[in-house]
């Protein structure tokens, strides 16, 4: 299955807010759908930088960089966005977008080891040039830690039973082996959902430190935004969306002064203004069922107080 960019027009339009020039970042290039649309809306003086750590995404991005001199790809995690931009002399930008979903090719190519639907080596690394593979990680992790990860990152109620079965199985080499163990250990299957869905999600998040990276990325993104610059982020499950929601809420709410024994006063430390929260339309969900769980949250950088 080829990759279909989710909330494509909504993301780019919310990012630009009617602008046609400036400096922008796609923090998760993927297969470049959002970046290409963004470039098509910008004038010849604009610049677009993109981040990715997936080797196949980097190949696609390198080809785009050859086609369009306004575009530059950076091989790095978006968790390093501020440092990497400063290294190339970019201190501030007009907009940053991120699509936190795993791309369809990653899910669908058996050799990448993400899929419980197709048998392949148990890998699950976004950047398969470094780090532990899923099979190596499962051998090293303690049963209690694994159960907690499956519960927290997969929101799986039978996490302890599943973790016990995985650890008792010993070395696993393929996604089919892991999926079968989870399937057998799972006492109650959800309608229209493979019983291994939540466990695979949890292991993938843990191996790639996905939630950690999001928590590091968001404040750096705001640091880089110019006043009126936009942050547009697409999430695909409640854990991601909760992080983004809480971050935007915190950055757009007046803080309480400690008061030091005096009556508390509100201190204006706000850096963001909420713009919108958007779901995929019925038409998009029909055309691309993977968009069903997607949420787009958009916020705008406020003017610096006292600047």
UniProtKB/Swiss-Prot annotation:
The keyword Methyltransferase applies. The gene is rsmH. Specifically methylates the N4 position of cytidine in position 1402 (C1402) of 16S rRNA. GO terms for biological process: rRNA base methylation. The keyword tRNA-binding does not apply. It comes from Acinetobacter baumannii (strain AB0057). This is Ribosomal RNA small subunit methyltransferase H. S-adenosyl-L-methionine binds at residues 32-34, 52, 78, 99, 106. SUPFAM superfamilies: Putative methyltransferase TM0872, insert domain, S-adenosyl-L-methionine-dependent methyltransferases. The lineage of its organism: Bacteria, Pseudomonadati, Pseudomonadota, Gammaproteobacteria, Moraxellales.
